[in-house]
Structure formats: structure tokens, C-alpha cells
Amino acid sequence: MDFRYLPMTQEDEKEMLQTIGADSIEDLLADIPASVRDQGTLEEVGIPLPETDLIRTLSKLADQNMNTKQYPSFLGAGIYDHYAPAVVNHMLLRSEFYTAYTPYQPEISQGELQAIFEYQTMICELTGMDVANSSMYDGITALAEAAMLACAHKKKKTIVLSDGVHPEAHDVVRTYANGPGLEVETLPLVNGETAIANLDALEDVACVIVQYPNFYGRVEDLQALADATHAKGGLFIVSANPLALGLLEAPGKLGADITIGDCQPFGIPQSFGGPTCGYFTTTKALMRKIPGRLVGQTVDEDGKRGFVLTLQAREQHIRRDKATSNICSNQALNALAASIAMSALGKRGIRELATRNLQTAYALKKSLIQAGFHIVDDGPSFNEFVVELPIDATEAGKQLLQAGIIGGLPLGTFDESRSNQMLVCATELRTKEELDQFVTALGGLTHA
């Protein structure tokens, strides 16, 4: 045989074409303009390789990547370089758990349901909220779903976002809002904090969304923001870094109606930006409007504790037209990674890890100030902040890479007026030597 297997015979092809009413493959592709079809061949791919040669070739390609195992990283902005305890992968790769899906006969998989229930419980404890779902795709889609919930619950059409919320979250919310015709307004930052006074001029406000700490690393006064939002008749939504909540007051205790965020800091690798795991928490009053799946605890007919998927009438696979959301999946595997990491750390460990992040970032900030750099907002922050550079931050990033350092995010990516500013992050993984190396490299920047 010329091939290991025959994926499709001519008879198979003919039968399938007849079934769909096409005479040929060309008929099947008729709606695709010839101008956009690839007319070339795959000769540039080369001849098939033995597995050993293929692995060698791919390894050489992979070696061209610059990764955080080789170079110290000062890049954050939503995806962070944290240590994942070894127990995370040890447990995650067990056959009992190694699936991204909740099962279609869920009550059979009591172990998986218990793991999700424990994840929900820990997230509620961190955020100070009453109920959490089993997870969402990522923090930003959780934020957009929270905005949709607020508009449906309040029967209002204006979503208000602080400029301290991740710029890409603004884009996702606007995409979500476009279909149902919702309005999206923004509140600027003044001296690093959300200008809540500007809320007075807005009408029909369904919610106000802030980030905690905000995109630029600043820790804002949530209570004042919550009070102003509620006075306007809207829901107060907080996008919170869950690791920071090891030190900061829980949003639920400061007036948040919904707290969402991304669990990536807990045991989930950076992986070029995903996949991660979004968490979604809210109050009992909004429990029946929360998107996604909920695992609840109950007892069986013998009085033994058990776990079930509960309140499923909210979900689109039960009643599509009246569902609270069209999301019908979750990130159960990554949620499990987060819950294993949180369990391994414990309450004291999470606090100590958060403290280490805080101390490392402040040590870097102090060193940069001593070296003559300007910190754009020197207010309270967690593990990232903005530094003003003498040259374009994108060019600075290239020079840092040449020095063996992954630099921070050039803010000119989102705002041309901030082209010389870099959002710098320092996690618990950065050593004093690496901090000194970074400061020295910034001091040696030259104009291109």
C-alpha cells in the first residue's frame, strides 16, 4: 500500500456529494470566489518526514522562541508569569480529570462535580460574593457577560466602563453591545483613579465596570465607586485579579454586585495569552440570572452528600429563547488547575504570595526612581505600574530583548500619546539580580 490508510475513497466522495446535491467538489466550492482560493501547491512544505526528523525540525523552530524560562519577564497586562506548584499538573493530568468538559451525565462524575464545587467555594471566599459559576472562557468574556446581565436585570441600555479597565475588554464589551443596540460610555482616569463624578451626566446607566487593581496597576477606592454607581441605579461590577485579593479587601465587602476576573495567576500557564479561566461571582439576588453552569451540593435518597448541576433552566440548552446567556461551556480543566493551586497554597499561602508580588514590584519601582526614571502614577499599586522612558517603549522592548529581557507592555499599543510609557510587571518569580538587570538595561537605552 502507498498509504497507511485511505481516509476517503472515490465511492465515498461520490456518495457524500450526491447526498448534499452537488455534482463535484468544484460545485461544493462554487460560492468561494476564485480570487481568494489558494491556487498554489504545498511543495514548499517539503516531503513527508519520519517522526524523529519531524521532532528535530520542530524543536529547532521552537528554539527560536523567546520564553520566560530563558529570559526574565516584566510583561503583565492580564497574563502573568507566576509559579505553578508541581502538584497542579500532577493532579490535572490524571485520567479522572483530564477533560475540558463537564460530563453530559454529570451526576455520574461525582469527583469532577465536587472539584468544581470546591472551585466555586474558594472563588466566593476570595471575592466575598455569594455564588460563583463553574467558570467561563476567560476574564474578559466574563466581564462582557456581566455587562449583559446588568442590562437585562436593570432593563437599561448604558454600560459604563472605567478607562482603568483593560483596553481589550472595552473592545469585547462593544462587540457584545453592538447586536442588542446597547450604549457603551467611558469614565476617564484623573490622577490614576476613575473620575466617578462624570457619571452624573450619564443617563439610563445599567452598570459601572472597574478593574481592581486597574489596568495600570493602581488600586482604587471601590467603596466610593460602588456608592456612586448605586446612587445612579446601576449594578457595580468589579474585574479583580484574584491573587491581589489575597491582600486587598474583597469586592463583595465594598459594594460589588458582580465580581469577575481571570484565574490565570493560579496555576494556569501563560500559553501566549490563553486558554485561561474566567470566574464569575455575584449575589444571591442575581443568582438565577448568572450565566454558565452551577454545581450545587445536595443529599441523595440515602442521606449521603452528592453534587449536581443546579438551576439549569437558566441555560440555553434547556430553553434557548429565555436563557440568561448563550454560553454553554466552561473551562473546567483550567478551573481545576486554579482550585488545585489555591488548595496547595491555602489562605496563608495566597496572602504570602500576594505580599511577595507587592514587595517585588515596590522594590523595582524604588530602584527605577533611584535610577532617575519617572513613575507615571506613584499611588498604591499591586504588582505592576507605568514607567516613563526616554525613548519609544516599543523600541525599548526590542533593545531589552537583545539584552535577554522580556520588557513590559508599550502603552502606545493602545494610546499613541503614551508611546514612551511602559506598563511594567514584577511577580514573585523575579529575583533581585533580575530587577537590577532590568534597571541597568533601561538605563542603557539608546535612540534608534
Swiss-Prot record:
InterPro entries for this protein: GcvPA (IPR023010), GDC-P_N (IPR049315), GDC_P (IPR020581), PyrdxlP-dep_Trfase (IPR015424), PyrdxlP-dep_Trfase_major (IPR015421), PyrdxlP-dep_Trfase_small (IPR015422)
Domain of life: Bacteria
SUPFAM superfamilies listed in its UniProt record: PLP-dependent transferases
Enzyme Commission (EC) number: 1.4.4.2
Catalytic activity: N(6)-[(R)-lipoyl]-L-lysyl-[glycine-cleavage complex H protein] + glycine + H(+) = N(6)-[(R)-S(8)-aminomethyldihydrolipoyl]-L-lysyl-[glycine-cleavage complex H protein] + CO2
PANTHER family according to UniProt: GLYCINE CLEAVAGE SYSTEM P-PROTEIN, GLYCINE DEHYDROGENASE (DECARBOXYLATING)
Function: The glycine cleavage system catalyzes the degradation of glycine. The P protein binds the alpha-amino group of glycine through its pyridoxal phosphate cofactor; CO(2) is released and the remaining methylamine moiety is then transferred to the lipoamide cofactor of the H protein.
Family membership noted in the UniProt record: Belongs to the GcvP family. N-terminal subunit subfamily.
Protein name, entry field: Probable glycine dehydrogenase (decarboxylating) subunit 1
Organism listed in the record: Exiguobacterium sibiricum (strain DSM 17290 / CCUG 55495 / CIP 109462 / JCM 13490 / 255-15)
Lineage, top ranks: Bacteria, Bacillati, Bacillota, Bacilli, Bacillales
Gene name in the database record: gcvPA
